[in-house]
């Protein structure tokens, strides 16, 4: 049952051995800003020019605006948070605005998402990953989602066990948050990185959408920067400003998420659901670069069968 979905046996092993672990803040230079809805926005054309891109003529819909260059491609939809950077979908924290026939993106989103996605070197590099902490989601009494073939907690453990064997064969140090069908408190899982050298934390899950059985694809979650909303939700003046340990390493976590997602899509052919922002406990309580991967949908008949 487990061998038909290539994602299950190789996804982390493909990405992690050569992955650089990044930390710090972006350094993308100065931008000319305009105040829109009490926020600092930057003309999208100037962002494109800074990354050596020019406007493209092709549009799939009226709100779509595209840019391309030798190195980068950028597509946005005005009035939405959706943006495609170098072929990978991302969800901005604030909508793309228009004024006077121009499109604008927030300075915050340039610094937190678009800039690091196109120029990860602008985030201070601290060296290659030396330890991978793999977290099989759920466990014990927490069964997670369910397909016609089994529970999420069993699938996540299987993915991690297979991945661990492959990574260890490549001389990568691997630590697992759980080795059996047991429940580990969510806040304890990311803390397992503290005893290891240059670690990353990767939590493995599968998606469910009983109300929409056709939903499919792969998405990777990372913590939003302090003061930013989560994907798909309006800004919350209280929750968005609550500090957590993961805020300090968010830039590094984002670069890890972007790198991982880009490679997963290329190797598995899965539907791109994007790099998204969320405040899951395993991301909030982390002191090292951390992401959560939702591999596929247990509630999608074809994906569940392949899993």
Predicted regions and their residues:
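Active-site-proximal helix/loop segments of hydrolytic enzymes
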Residues: 150-307
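Bacterial N-terminal signal peptides that target proteins for export
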Residues: 2-12
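Bacterial N-terminal signal peptides
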Residues: 10-23
């Amino acid at each position: 049952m487990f061998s038909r979905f290539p994602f299950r046996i190789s996804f982390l092993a493909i990405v992690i051995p050569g992955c650089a672990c990044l930390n710090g803040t972006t350094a993308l230079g100065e931008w000319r800003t305009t105040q829109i809805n009490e926020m600092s926005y930057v003309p999208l054309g100037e962002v494109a020019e800074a990354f050596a891109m020019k406007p493209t003529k092709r549009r799939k819909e009226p709100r779509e605006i595209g840019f391309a260059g030798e190195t980068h491609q950028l597509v946005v939809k005005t009035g939405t948070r959706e943006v495609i950077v170098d072929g990978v979908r991302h969800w901005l924290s604030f909508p793309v605005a228009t004024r006077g026939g121009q499109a604008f993106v927030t300075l915050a989103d340039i610094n937190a998402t678009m800039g690091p996605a196109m120029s990860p070197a602008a985030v201070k590099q601290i060296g290659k990953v030396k330890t991978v902490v793999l977290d099989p989601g759920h466990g014990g009494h927490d069964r997670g989602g369910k397909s016609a073939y089994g529970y999420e907690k069993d699938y996540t453990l299987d993915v991690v066990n297979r991945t661990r064997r492959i990574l260890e064969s490549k001389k990568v140090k691997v630590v697992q948050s759980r080795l059996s069908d047991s429940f580990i408190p969510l806040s304890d899982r990311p803390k397992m990185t503290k005893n290891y050298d240059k670690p990353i934390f990767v939590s493995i899950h599968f998606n469910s959408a009983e109300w929409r059985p056709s939903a499919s694809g792969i998405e990777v979650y990372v913590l939003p920067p302090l003061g930013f909303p989560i994907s798909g939700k309006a800004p919350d003046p209280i929750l968005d400003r609550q500090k957590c340990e993961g805020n300090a390493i968010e830039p590094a976590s984002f670069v890890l998420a972007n790198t991982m997602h880009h490679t997963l899509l290329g190797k598995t052919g899965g539907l791109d659901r994007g790099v998204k922002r969320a405040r899951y406990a395993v991301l909030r309580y982390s002191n090292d670069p951390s992401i959560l991967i939702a591999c596929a949908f247990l509630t999608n008949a074809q994906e569940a069968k392949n899993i």
